[in-house]
């Protein structure tokens, strides 16, 4: 299997029990997770040699995050240690018409204040097949944006395939700031992943589609995919399409374009959703595995969508599924019967 590198922040999610609201809670569960950390764990579960690059404090709270990565087989040798803070976020799980809610407390975390000398990106990228990052990392600080650029440059020097999940977060930066940072980084990217909102707010493109209104046909994305491909020279443009009927009932499918053909995956109805956090990251992890191991872009996309559908049934940020489990769902086995 391949050496896959991800760069980003792992945080600690603090969540009330079950569907309790923040204001009624007297205790919180600690759940480690973060975009690129979640991707690293996904590809490690699929048998790849996964490396997570970040910076965490030396104290015990930082060690919680390091241990979470090690537990699921991710190599942590490129996690720098130092600084004072692990990023936190509070997540309240919604139900029915009440949406989930997130409050961030991540300012001045160790990775947000990390310096280039904390990492030897040429050593990190040596022998790697794939490097993945998301728009969350450059959003957390200007220093993290510079680290992202340096990592991308090193990846290109070493012939590494680069993927990005645009992943716009309005609580971290404005669209204007995102466009100014993200567009120059696209010259390093081979595989661009994002939904219709990400394409508009991170790159300035406006697709003719409305997921909230239920318009999730591939035709609404064809023009925008072609524009993105023409401007940035991506090998693949990929988008997930989510229909949100309630906090616990979503429709889920995806599209991929390789410059020649569009492919739309099968559609899943996920009901009930156990935990939506990490759903997009599980898609990215599945797509990376699929593009590395499958014969066609369609097969790769079906693996990614099935992997992500399964993630919605699992508590926590991490997609703790095997290749066989994903293949079974992608192949049509969604009956939920006991596997003996």
Task: Cite the ranges covered by each PLM segment.
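Glycine-rich phosphate/adenosyl-contacting loop at the front of the ribokinase-like
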Residues: 1-75, 79, 95-97, 111-116, ...
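Active-site metal-binding loops of divalent metal-dependent hydrolases
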Residues: 10, 136, 166, 282
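C-terminal domain-closing interface element
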Residues: 90-95, 322-340
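Conserved phosphate-binding/catalytic loop of the ribokinase/pfkB sugar-kinase fold
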Residues: 92-145
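A short helix->loop->beta-strand "cap" motif at the edges of active sites that frequently abuts
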Residues: 154-161, 232-235
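Hydrophobic faces of well-ordered beta-strands that scaffold small-molecule active sites
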Residues: 162-164, 192
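Conserved phosphate/ATP/ADP-binding segment of small-molecule kinases
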Residues: 172-259
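Conserved post-catalytic alpha-helical subdomain immediately downstream of the catalytic base
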Residues: 263-333
